[in-house]
């Protein structure tokens, strides 16, 4: 059974970048928003150009994050996510998928770019829920431990539940996160 604790499971190097900046609105997020808007307006040639810029900016941001983690923890290694690498990725992995479905590929690339320590994982989750509510299930998430359950809302942290009896009494064992929407999506809590 899964064990509660902070150091029980493997963690990506990107999540250990303790000195990497936390961004409220990053340049690559702005570009991804612009690319999505252009896709929705059927301006695909403009959207493609902006998506390429967004991916390049996202790669640079991830490179900064990884270099921070490498430095912070004294790990020997390097990270090359340069503009050339990003362009090669776009040309060889993204372009054909974008041509087939511009909006879907834009949203998938945005989701991938938000991984890491820059504070954008929550935005990726918001996009996931927004797209699902709009009937656009471009991003498929799965829970390998329970294929029918995926959180509909953000949970209380384990320290909040363990140290505050009021939270435990009000919310029980936390299973409501799989069945109840947040208040702005029709939930009651």
Spans of features found by a protein language model:
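Acidic/polar-rich alpha-helix caps and helix-coil junctions
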Residues: 1-189
